[in-house]
Amino acid sequence: MPHIDSMMTPFPHSIEASVTIHDAQAIMASEGIRHLPVTSEGRLVGMISDRDLKLAYALAGSSQSEETLHVGDVCNLEAYITEYNTPVDDVVMHMAEIRVGTAMITRNGKLVGIFTTTDVCRNYAELLKIAYPDA
């Protein structure tokens, strides 16, 4: 079974927990991404998604503006993190079991990649082409 590092997206963008949600949304829009691993003082602490940002904007209302809410205030601190040499099937099954669309991939505690449902679909399509070359 191949390891997750053979199917992940390497060197993902990440964001510091102290950055405003406004800036996080701008980064996601400019890079065309939906997930950002969150770091604090160089340590991986969570994940923020475009869905998290939409919810934060909806709940903030007049109590907090987008300039005062920070990524660390709204990110998922329970994000799925696994090592680069974990078998792909284990990662995909665990993602399905805990119902998440993203896994952050580390090597010796350092972020080296991200694996999303988009990566699952891309790799599945490649396998289908191999299994059914004449289709």
Language model regions located:
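A glycine-centered beta-loop-beta connector
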Residues: M28-E31, L36-D52, M95, A103-D119
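C-terminal basic regulatory modules in eukaryotic proteins
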Residues: H70, G101-T102
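The conserved cystathionine-beta-synthase
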Residues: S14-G32, T39, I81-R99, I105-T106, ...
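Tandem CBS (Bateman) regulatory domains
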Residues: M1-F11, S49-Y80, P87-A96, L111, ...
